[in-house]
């Protein structure tokens, strides 16, 4: 989760306010296939802001859609790249004619999706996420309630994104070591 927030903060000053003018999907899929209408929805849309929910980057677009990016384990966003590397899978150009962004993912564990922002609460990747650990929604009582009835080892339970959203293996291991 902290890594995704760092990426969000890094992309925001470069991409917020930019209009997507070109998209080059250099393969039909990452972890999952790209939506059929991915390029058509993106081209001409302005990135109004970039949010984060759990491990997902949410690019809020002017056309009423949200473009979602999950980095997986090895996904990287680079602004200003020509995108000619072997693992540069998605290349974007923006309205100033000079700005570019590239999504690179050596292992292709990341993925992208696009959906109508008004339907976000029903979106399959986001609808069942639990509270994030650094928000006011996360309390000892909420954690207790979300763990109630779990029969798995505590590490597996904490990695379940329905219980606590945004925790990965490294953070859960550190939490359990310190507890």
Predicted regions and their residues:
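Structured catalytic/nucleic-acid-binding cores of DNA maintenance enzymes
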Residues: 1-179
């Amino acid at each position: 989760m902290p890594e995704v927030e760092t990426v969000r903060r890094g992309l925001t000053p470069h991409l917020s306010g930019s209009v997507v003018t070109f998209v080059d999907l250099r393969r039909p899929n990452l972890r999952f296939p790209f939506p059929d209408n991915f390029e058509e929805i993106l081209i001409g849309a302005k990135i109004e802001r970039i949010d984060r929910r759990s491990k997902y980057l949410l690019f809020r677009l002017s056309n009423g859609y949200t473009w979602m990016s999950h980095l997986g384990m090895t996904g990287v966003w680079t602004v200003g790249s020509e995108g000619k590397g072997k693992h540069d899978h998605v290349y974007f150009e923006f309205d100033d004619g000079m700005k570019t962004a590239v999504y690179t993912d050596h292992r292709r564990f990341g993925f992208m999706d696009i959906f109508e922002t008004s339907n976000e609460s029903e979106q399959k990747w986001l609808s069942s996420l639990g509270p994030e650990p650094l928000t006011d929604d996360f309390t000892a009582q909420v954690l207790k309630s979300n763990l109630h009835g779990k029969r798995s080892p505590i590490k597996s339970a904490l990695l379940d994104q329905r219980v606590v959203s945004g925790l990965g293996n490294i953070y859960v291991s550190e939490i359990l070591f310190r507890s």
